[in-house]
A protein has these predicted regions:
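Non-catalytic C-terminal accessory region of glycerolipid acyltransferases
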Residues: 91-195
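Secondary-structure boundary/capping positions in well-ordered alpha/beta enzyme cores
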Residues: 20, 55-56, 81, 103, ...
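Residues at the C-termini of beta-strands that transition into short coil/loop
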Residues: 26, 63, 84, 142, ...
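Short, Lys/Arg-enriched, disordered terminal segments
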Residues: 1-4, 193-195
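Short gly/ser/thr-rich secondary-structure transition/capping motifs
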Residues: 15-23, 87, 142-144
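Catalytic core of membrane glycerolipid acyltransferases/transacylases, capturing the structured
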Residues: 2, 6, 15, 28-87, ...
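A short beta-turn/loop motif at secondary-structure boundaries
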Residues: 26-28, 153
Length: 195
């Protein structure tokens, strides 16, 4: 209920003040576990992805965000869970796998951090590890910054492109980085197709 209320509120905000557009939202399966992957260039990205999709999305969020009482409470209520990016966070990975096992949608930003220039960064292998362990399909989301409101980067405007789901669980594949690169290539392909 709280998640749906917040999603409606942000959809209204992005629609009225940002002129955002969402393409291909129907590509996200309406049932079953899915790992959503997206490029990352703004603090707004999780809010935008969560607002664009028709199901509740659980995000890995950097652990220090939970140290702020109000923010930590809000993002926890919205289904986010902490990840320590300085190390392999087994607790966070187990939480993501548990959510996927329950048939939920989990989103991860394969780059592991925001790209300050907006260009795609090399992916880390975490998303590929989750897919391999959970055996779930992947839904790529490409975020495009279209313009800025109020002449600054506080409220970036987006085009959101949701691609068709795909699988990376090929028999005999053992290279996580190769799978991570494949996943990032899907995001890049969406961005290139939208130009």
């Amino acid at each position: 209920m709280f998640y749906r209320f917040c999603r409606s509120l942000f959809r209204f905000f992005f629609g009225v003040f940002c002129g955002w557009e969402v393409f291909g939202a129907e590509n996200l399966p309406q049932k079953g576990p899915v790992l959503v992957i997206a490029n990352h260039f703004s603090y707004w990205d999780p809010v935008v992805v969560g607002s664009a999709l028709g199901r509740q999305v659980h995000f890995m969020a950097k652990s220090n965000l939970f140290s702020y009482p109000v923010l930590g409470f809000l993002i926890s209520k919205l289904g986010a869970f902490p990840v320590d990016r300085r190390r392999i966070d087994r607790t966070s990975l187990k939480r993501a796998l548990s959510l996927l096992d329950e048939g939920k949608v989990v989103c991860i930003f394969p780059e592991g951090t925001r790209s300050k220039t907006g260009t795609l960064l090399p992916p880390l292998p975490g998303a590929a590890f989750l897919v391999r362990k959970a055996g779930v399909s992947v839904c790529p989301v490409a975020l495009q910054r279209k313009k800025r409101i109020f002449g600054n980067n506080l409220f970036p405007c987006y085009h959101v492109h949701v691609g068709a789901t795909f699988s990376v669980n090929k028999p005999g594949r053992r290279d996580l980085q190769a799978d991570a690169d494949l996943m990032m290539a899907k995001i890049k392909e969406l961005l290139e197709d939208s130009i």
